[in-house]
């Protein structure tokens, strides 16, 4: 969904976002000065030296902070070569891996806490807030201070510009409303003031809202993505408390989420100082030399960008983000067709492929595979029709219809929307590249948040005995707990 943070969603339009921002700055910042200084009939006349100096200083600060917000590297994790090559060692108990981390399939590397894979930057971004199309860059651990300064100086310049504009609108138009038209401002001046007023109002409103939401997130220590995750978690809890067990309706687990507090809120001052990279508040809003936090790649898994202080409100560390029961349910049901091994009997030995078969045997095998594919497609269609029938029955239930209008059913990260209609995909997160809560390193099962299932509390992890996808590990865990042998 298009909004202030995510920008236009139409393919190809985002490449024009930065030129559009530059054009808007030039129009409001420099065309306005040209109009005010050349329209002698527009009271109270040209800008004074003091007004020009203040306005142009604000514009210089705006340009500097915008350039930094666009060009500063959002950060990149660098793992030791041995750690990346010896990935299976980390997947065993006793490996050198972190206490808890996700695994990025595209980067083929662990994903530290609060990091996400950006589909625009094509890498995992430390403490990713969102990908901003207006800067063409990710708002992250390293770029957030520059982004915040840009918003502050932009709003300051707009407020001062409003003073200059409305002074001329009052004295040049309203105060002379009874004067004959030929003695008032020219048509060009009137048209210019009208366009400037419209552009100023739209820009001031949008950027003031963006500044307020950004400052709020800054003080709470949350990123936009984490606010989205927190809202989804609250929605899941609300459905659970109301007895609306969406996940147990199909008999695949009956997940009941356990409340998880946001662990990275350590107080207003600590949150703000951590985000700006220094406790010296005098440097926070310097357009040059203000700096910001830098990721510590010299000591992987330790230092800035790799670990974050928690407030201790949860039973264990590393419980954020809360698990997505819908995603776990699909994986426990067989990974939704993601991995063929989930539907295979792994204990059955497969005959070796005979590469010297005749052409007739190959044709027969090909036709057999076609029949199997057709049968699987028919089963999927049948399953889909059964779901449609269930939904049709639920729609006849007035109570369910009323509940569905107030809360959206939880879906995967791409489809679930918050109250503003945003998904993780809108924030730039490549949701398809995230393995579910499970870089299976040392002690992972002890640090993951528990999820209540039909068979008890589970951390969503399977046995860590082989280097297999997490969905398969979860499936084996379910089979083992239910005593079902394939």
UniProtKB/Swiss-Prot annotation:
Domain DHHC, first and last residues per copy: 102-152
Recorded topology in the membrane: Multi-pass membrane protein
InterPro entries on file: Palmitoyltrfase_DHHC, PFA4, PFA4/ZDH16/20/ERF2-like
Cytoplasmic compartment segments: 1-15, 73-146, 202-486
Catalytic residues identified in the record: 132
Predominant subcellular localization, coarse grouping: endoplasmic reticulum
A GO molecular-function descriptor: protein-cysteine S-palmitoyltransferase activity
Lumenal side stretches: 37-51, 167-178
GO cellular component, one term: endoplasmic reticulum membrane
Biased composition (Acidic residues): 386-399
Subcellular location: Endoplasmic reticulum membrane
Family as reported in the entry's similarity comment: Belongs to the DHHC palmitoyltransferase family. PFA4 subfamily.
Domain remark from Swiss-Prot or TrEMBL: The DHHC domain is required for palmitoyltransferase activity.
Function: Mediates the reversible addition of palmitate to target proteins, thereby regulating their membrane association and biological function.
Protein name: Palmitoyltransferase pfa4
Annotated organism of origin: Neurospora crassa (strain ATCC 24698 / 74-OR23-1A / CBS 708.71 / DSM 1257 / FGSC 987)
Gene behind this protein: ptr-4
């Amino acid at each position: 969904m298009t909004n202030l943070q995510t920008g236009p969603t139409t393919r190809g339009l985002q490449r024009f976002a930065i030129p559009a921002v530059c054009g808007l700055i030039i129009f409001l910042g420099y065309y306005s000065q040209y109009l005010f200084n050349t329209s002698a009939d527009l009271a109270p006349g040209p800008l004074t030296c003091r007004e020009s100096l203040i306005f142009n200083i604000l514009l210089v600060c705006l340009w500097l902070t915008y350039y930094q917000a666009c060009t500063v590297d959002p950060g990149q994790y660098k793992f030791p070569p041995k750690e990346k090559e010896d990935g299976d060692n980390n997947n065993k108990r006793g490996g050198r891996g972190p206490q808890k981390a996700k695994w990025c399939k595209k980067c083929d590397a662990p994903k530290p806490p609060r990091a996400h894979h950006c589909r625009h930057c094509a890498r995992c971004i430390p403490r990713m807030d969102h990908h901003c199309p207006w800067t063409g860059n990710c708002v992250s651990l390293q770029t957030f201070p520059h982004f915040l300064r840009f918003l502050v100086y932009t709003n300051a310049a707009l407020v001062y510009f409003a003073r200059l504009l409305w002074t001329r609108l009052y004295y040049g138009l309203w105060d002379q409303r009874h004067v004959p038209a030929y003695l008032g401002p020219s048509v060009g001046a009137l048209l210019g003031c009208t366009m400037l007023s419209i552009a100023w109002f739209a820009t001031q409103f949008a950027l003031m809202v963006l500044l307020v939401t950004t400052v709020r997130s800054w003080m709470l220590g949350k990123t936009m993505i984490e606010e989205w995750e927190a809202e989804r978690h609250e929605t899941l809890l609300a459905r659970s408390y109301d007895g609306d067990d969406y996940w147990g309706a199909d008999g695949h687990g009956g997940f009941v989420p356990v409340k998880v507090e946001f662990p990275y809120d350590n107080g207003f001052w600590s949150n703000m100082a951590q985000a700006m990279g220094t406790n010296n508040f005098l440097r926070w809003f310097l357009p040059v030399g203000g700096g910001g936090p830098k990721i510590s790649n010299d000591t992987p898994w330790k230092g800035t960008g790799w670990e974050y202080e928690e407030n201790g409100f949860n039973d264990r560390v590393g419980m954020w983000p809360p698990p997505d029961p819908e995603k776990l349910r699909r994986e426990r049901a067989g990974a939704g067709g993601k991995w063929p091994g989930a539907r295979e009997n792994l204990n059955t030995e497969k005959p070796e492929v005979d590469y010297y078969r005749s052409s007739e045997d190959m044709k027969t095998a090909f036709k057999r595979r076609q029949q199997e594919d057709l049968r699987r497609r028919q089963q999927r269609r049948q399953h889909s029709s059964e779901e449609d029938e269930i939904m049709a029955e639920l729609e006849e239930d007035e109570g369910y219809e009323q509940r569905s209008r107030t809360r959206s059913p939880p879906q995967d990260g791409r489809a679930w929307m918050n109250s503003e209609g945003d998904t993780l995909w809108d924030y730039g997160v490549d949701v398809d590249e995230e393995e579910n809560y499970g870089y299976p390193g040392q002690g992972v099962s002890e640090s993951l948040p528990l999820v209540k299932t039909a068979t008890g509390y589970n951390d969503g992890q399977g046995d860590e005995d082989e280097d297999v996808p997490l969905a398969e590990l979860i499936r084996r865990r379910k089979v083992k707990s239910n005593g079902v042998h394939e």
